[in-house]
Structures are given as C-alpha cells and as structure tokens.
Amino acid sequence: MRIASFNINGTKARLPRLIEWLEERRPAVACLQEIKCADDAFPAAEFEKIGYRAIWHGQKGFNGVAILADGVEPVEATRGLPGDPEDVQSRYIEADVAGVRVVNLYLPNGNPQPGPKFDYKIAWMERLRARLCELLEAELPTVVVGDFNVIPEDKDTFSVRAMQHDALMQPASRDAYRRILNDGWTDAIDTLNPRGGVWTFWDYQAGAWQRDHGFRIDHLLLSPQAADRLRAAGVDKEYRGREKASDHAPVWVELADQR
C-alpha cells in the first residue's frame, strides 16, 4: 500500500502536473497540501475521471488539504486540528482508508520569526502532538503525512548557514518535532536514509533546483503498527523538474499488506 504526500502549491495552477503524477505513480492514497481553493472549487470530478475519490478541507487562496484514495471512498474521521476552536485555517484532515488511519497536514511556516506567526506555529505543533498521542493510544495503523515546515536536523538541508535564521530550523521547531517522534512515531524517510541528504523542497528563487539547494520538510510518520509494515519510502524527485512544477516533490511510503 503506497501512501503519498504532495504539496502542490495550488490546485488550479498545478492540476495537469498532479493528474500526470497520479496516473504515472498510482499511489493507493494521495494526500495534498496547499490546494488553495474553497471547498466548492475543488476539482473532485477531475480526480474521479481517473479513479480517485476525495475528501478535502479547503480555504480560498490559502492552505487547504485533501485526501485522495484510488478506487475507494476515504472515510473522513476528523476535519481541522482539535484544540483551538478559534483557529479557522484549513490545515488538517484525517480519513480511514483500507484499515489505515491517514492524517494529512499542512503545518504553519512560522516566518518571520520571532513573532506571532512563529508563536502560532509552535502552539499548532503542541496541539498536533496532543492529537497524535490520542491516535497512538488507539493502537491502529496510522500514517501522518504532509508539509511539516520543519527541517529536523542539519543533515536535512543543503546549507545550515543559509537556513539558520529561518523558522523551519529554529530550536523550538526542531524540539517540537522531536517530541512528537519521541512519543512513538517513526520518520520513514529518515529511518531508511540515516545519513540525510534527501530533499523534498527546492525554492523557485536563486536557481535552487538547478543547483540542488533543497531541504527536507515533507515527512511521513508511522505509528508502531504501521512501522512494522514499512517496506520503502522515497521522493519522486523528477516531478520537481517538470514544467510548471510545484516547489515540492511528492514523497511516499510503502507499507506491506496487512496479514
């Protein structure tokens, strides 16, 4: 079972590239971030044409997440991250697909830091940790994917110096991410690539893609029940180099079939 995550940086702008990727790679589940459209503008019919059913949590012009499943209906479990009823940003959705709880998130960027945007990021991560602890207690196969906007370690960026003042790798961001892992989650890509050097994002500026100046901020976290089924994980890097590409590449994890 392949579960993929792709920050598409706008459904409207990227739909041909997205359809292309889905048809070529055919993940069982595809989680999208930054769909950047209102609920009534999400192109669900286009995905149905190629066999994918979808649920989504949209927001006009910003944020937005969706879960697509190949040939089956994803069963929505949670919409919006619990813990703050005043938070109206569309960044979080959960669904059950083929016996796996799939969590899709778009974590706040936090720049500029310090400031209220960074404070919101850290508070959001604490709420996320609380929700993920609840999911761990359920002891079900759970996969948490998305754009976390956190560079976990120095090995996960092309240049520590270039990123040292960015919210993506501040000590508070890294500590919050580490606390989540320490609760019992497995970072699939890091587990299979312990030496680092795996990028999932390349900026549009300064020739970052051409110079391979990237970093890893799109993550795939597995509960113990899912980690036992880990077969492979990787990045579909080639899609970042295609015409009108997102600044992220798709990431994916392969789970063995449940016995």
What are these model-predicted stretches?
Residues 234-259:
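Surface polyanion/phosphate-binding segment centered on an Asp-His-Pro turn
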Residues 50, 124-217:
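Metal-dependent phosphoesterases centered on the DNase I-like endonuclease/exonuclease/phosphatase
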Residues 35-38, 42-112:
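Structured beta-strand-rich core segments of catalytic domains in phosphoester-bond hydrolases
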Residues 1-10, 99-114, 145:
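Active-site-proximal beta-strand elements of phosphoester/diester hydrolases
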Residues 3-7, 22-40, 102, 131-154, ...:
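Active-site beta-strand/loop signature of hydrolases that rely on acidic residues for catalysis
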Residues 61-75, 196, 208-229, 255:
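Conserved beta strand-loop-helix elements of the APE1-like EEP
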